[in-house]
Curated annotation (Swiss-Prot):
Disulfide bonds: none annotated. This is Arginine--tRNA ligase. The gene is argS. The keyword Ligase applies. Pfam families: Arg_tRNA_synt_N, DALR_1, tRNA-synt_1d.
Length: 581
């Protein structure tokens, strides 16, 4: 509905240009907002005030002119001027009802799909030398939610799990794997079941034994030279490490697969060419033996130009080099229209520099959008980055185990007579959903406090509340199994029916914001408001005990669309729904 009003206003502006009211080259930014006070209509715009200077007219006069020139629309019941020149639109109830009716049988819930694009999404991307920890949670689940929403809206999405599968640390790890196998044979495989312990043990050997450190450095050289033995060890290590990652992905309900892995090592063959191409364009400068690029727009507080280091003095490459190679691949091979990077906000400067350099060096097409969608940190209740009681890094699998344990206690307390298998399944969904939703419901760019107590509450904007809200709506149909709705029509008469209908009609607008800005918290807020709107509707408007069949059937259709929207919205967040709790 919002996009429809924007379209009407765009047509009006074009008419003004043709009439000479506005300059022919004038470009207007049209903003349409939902009103908070329904006495002021459903939607409003301040367009008249924005056009005053260009049109040379006062805002109220211009507002009336806009209304007089608006194309006719069955969706608009009336239009009014308010205050200094706001234009308020009142949506026609029957047109809204027809829109909702059509949405019920549509797999996209009545959402008009945008022009499809090819969108590469770089997310999760853990280092394979260690197990996934809580620091990987935000990139993984925020990225996955945006990916799901992009696909639902018809875009071609290419997932890229840019894992850290290369670097000098692998010499140390391979040397330790080699040593363990010499001592214990294939039993050494068991040591890798705990990657953190394996990594610490390898690091200790590296620090304490000069002979071991020499062997580790030798293995790095041999690995980078393509040695078959080293590459075999490296592939085995990566395979075990990736298995750990995908166990976590499966538990989290994340859609990444092995086929989506395109790690740092995938770009090794192109790194030397990146350096040569930058040098050929005269962009490289020598600085203390390293090859760097200075860009005038990036300076420190003292006004000194900040370098992008492309190659170290010892010949080694850096993240920037790999990122440039990846951008070139994503532009020339994957033909991306947009590339989205879900990486910690602390990497903002790095991405600003490499995005700018990729464009400057023509490694990417000018029409390809490069977007760093950064996020804040997940903190403990002391406001500091989330740690174990001993100050260590919290493994993601341990966090999920605790969530499951706490959820099981919660579900059992509310269902003391439920069988253990059902309790366990409900607890699994509630526990994982609580962790994911607590994160996704926060503004992506904000830090947030992790609290099991808050996230497992049945009150407020939480996963348990929304899961219960869905079961409550779906439960209506368990008591209405013999009712035929094939010929039923939605009729909006009661104020709460209209409020619910208006909220349902906003789903498409919300999803557009999710994919345009990479902000799943907007969808979380919408689903919470939708659940509240349904609760108000259900209290004020009897469904199965309605006054007549026409009213009952209409309210059942509204309930059905609410259930469909809640379920789809939660699914786009990567959250399963339950039929009972």
């Amino acid at each position: 509905m919002k996009s429809h009003i924007q379209s009407l206003l765009e047509q009006t502006i074009e008419s003004f240009k043709q009439q000479g009211i506005l300059p022919a080259d004038f470009e207007a930014r049209i903003q349409v907002d939902r009103t908070k006070d329904k006495s002021h209509g459903d939607l409003a715009t301040n367009l008249a005030m924005m056009l005053t200077k260009a049109a040379g007219k006062n805002p109220r006069e211009l507002a009336q002119l806009i209304i007089d020139n608006l194309p006719a629309s069955a969706y608009v019941a009336k239009v009014e001027i308010a205050g200094p020149g706001f234009i308020n639109f009142f949506i026609d109830d029957s047109a809204l009802a027809n829109q909702l009716q059509a949405a019920i049988s549509d797999e996209h819930l009545g959402i008009k799909l945008p022009t499809p694009q090819t969108i590469v999404v770089d997310y999760s991307s853990p280092n394979l030398a260690k197990e996934m920890h809580v620091g990987h949670l935000r990139s993984t689940i925020i990225g996955d939610s945006v990916v799901r929403t992009l696909e639902f809206l018809g875009h071609k999405v290419i997932r890229q799990n840019h894992v850290g599968d290369w670097g000098t640390q692998f010499g140390m790890l391979l040397a330790y794997m080699e040593e363990l196998r010499a001592q214990n044979g294939e039993q050494a495989q068991l040591e890798l079941s705990d990657l953190e312990t394996f990594y610490r043990a390898a690091k200790l050997r590296f620090d304490e034994s000069a002979e071991f450190a020499t062997r580790a450095r030798q293995l790095v050289v041999e690995l980078q030279s393509g040695d078959e033995y080293c590459n075999k060890l490296w592939r085995e290590f990566n395979d075990i490490s990736l298995s750990h990652c995908h166990e976590v992905y499966e538990r989290l309900g994340v859609s990444l697969t092995r086929a989506d892995v395109h790690g740092e090592s995938a770009y090794n063959a192109d790194l030397e060419q990146v350096v040569k191409d930058l040098d050929a364009q005269g962009l490289l400068t020598q600085s203390n033996g390293a090859k760097v690029v200075f860009q005038e727009e990036f300076r420190n507080k003292e006004g000194e130009a900040l370098p992008v280091i492309i190659q170290k003095a010892d010949g080694g490459y850096l993240y920037a080099t790999t990122d440039l190679a990846a951008m070139r691949y994503r532009s020339s091979v994957l033909k991306a229209d947009r590339v989205l990077y879900f990486v910690d906000l602390r990497q903002a400067l790095h991405f600003q520099q490499v995005f700018s350099l990729a464009k400057l060096a023509k490694f990417v097409r000018n029409d390809m959008s490069l977007e760093h969608l950064g996020f804040g940190t997940m903190n403990g209740e002391d406001g500091r980055p989330f740690k174990t009681r001993t100050g260590g890094v919290v493994k993601l699998v341990d966090l999920l185990d605790e969530a499951n344990t706490r959820a099981l206690e919660l579900v059992r307390s509310k269902n003391p007579d439920m069988d253990e298998a059902t309790l366990a399944e409900i607890a699994r969904v509630v526990g994982i959903s609580a962790v994911k939703y607590a994160d996704l419901s926060k503004n992506r760019t904000s830090d947030y406090i992790f609290s099991f107590e808050q996230m497992l509450s049945f009150e407020g904007n939480t996963a348990p509340y929304l899961l219960y809200a869905y079961t409550r709506v779906a439960g209506i149909f368990k008591r209405a199994t013999d009712i035929d709705l094939s010929q039923a029509k939605i009729v909006l008469e009661h104020e709460k029916e209209k409020d619910l209908g208006n909220k349902l009609a906003q789903f498409g607008e919300i999803l557009s914001r999710v994919v345009d800005k990479g902000q799943p918290h907007v969808l979380c807020g919408y689903l919470y408001e939708l659940a509240g709107a349904f609760s108000s509707f259900y209290e004020a408007c009897p469904v199965l005990a309605a006054d007549n069949d026409e009213q009952k059937h209409s309210r059942l259709l509204l309930s059905q669309l609410t259930a469909n929207t809640l379920q789809k919205g939660l699914n786009l967040l990567g959250i399963e729904t339950l039929e009972r709790m």
